[in-house]
Amino acid sequence: MRKFIARPFVVVSLFLSTYAQAQTDSIVLKDISWDNGSPAGMTELFIPSGNATLAGFIYKANGPQKHPTLLLLHGYPGNERNLDLAQVVRAHGWNVIYFDYRGSWGSQGQFGFKNCVEDVVNVVAFCKKNQDSLKIDTSNIVLFGHSMGGWVCLKALQQLPEVKKGVALSTWNIYDDYKKVLTEKELLLLANDPDRGGRYFVLNASLKDIFSPVLKDPGYFNLANGAAALTGKQVIMLDEHDHNRLLADAIKSLNKSYFDYQVWQTDHPFTNKRVALIKMVLSFLDR
């Protein structure tokens, strides 16, 4: 009799454990109930940056009040846009702005890593200028960057005292990839490697224009040099490898606000961890 009872108990326990685990990997979505006076929607944006105009759009949250706003910073060249995340964050009551850097995907101007950082600063300025029409709560703007966008996120946070939070997903630490390169010829050979990206026709710049600054100004590209400037920021770094461990340790050692570094079993765009990623971001936004 005891054996007969124990077995179903074990089975039920395993079922409940599996069910609970499945629950943690799920997310419940429901359609937005429109505010008739100020419904959620999407608006194209044309954002000035330098002497160029950036193409972008805003997923506007529902309701007439000003909303906290998440800025999505894409990678190199920017195939993964994380718009699944954007839709859920918007349903959570946030605006989400996506834009293409200068010289990428049709935005005007010349592409460059430093320009990307400057573009983020200019997008934040655009948010301030248009906060009433776009219903942006400029006291609560958060950056989310993927790959090169993770590098851009950490660099831009250093220049934006009013932005307190950032998520750096699978950060491309550009300096680490090229710190041992001594000549421009060697640099361009590496940059042209298809496994490292190669020549993207969607970027309005030559490989020389894009990568030569890394050789000329390595200190700027070394994210560890800016760790002290992130002391008061709330930062999450997520990776699919541990290549950024030393960088994360450097930031954590100086951070006095909030810092979390995790390595997940996934690929570069976090293909099998979309729900877990979205849930972590929502929790972070609610902090």
Segments (PLM) and residue ranges:
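Short beta-strand element of the alpha/beta-hydrolase
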Residues: 66-75
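Conserved alpha/beta-hydrolase
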Residues: 89-108
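Alpha/beta-hydrolase active-site loop
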Residues: 112-134
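Serine-hydrolase catalytic core
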Residues: 207-280
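N-terminal cap/lid segment of alpha/beta-hydrolase-fold proteins
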Residues: 23-64
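Hydrolase active-site cap/lid region
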Residues: 25, 158-209
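Alpha/beta-hydrolase fold nucleophile elbow
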Residues: 134-147
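The serine-hydrolase catalytic nucleophile loop
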Residues: 75-88
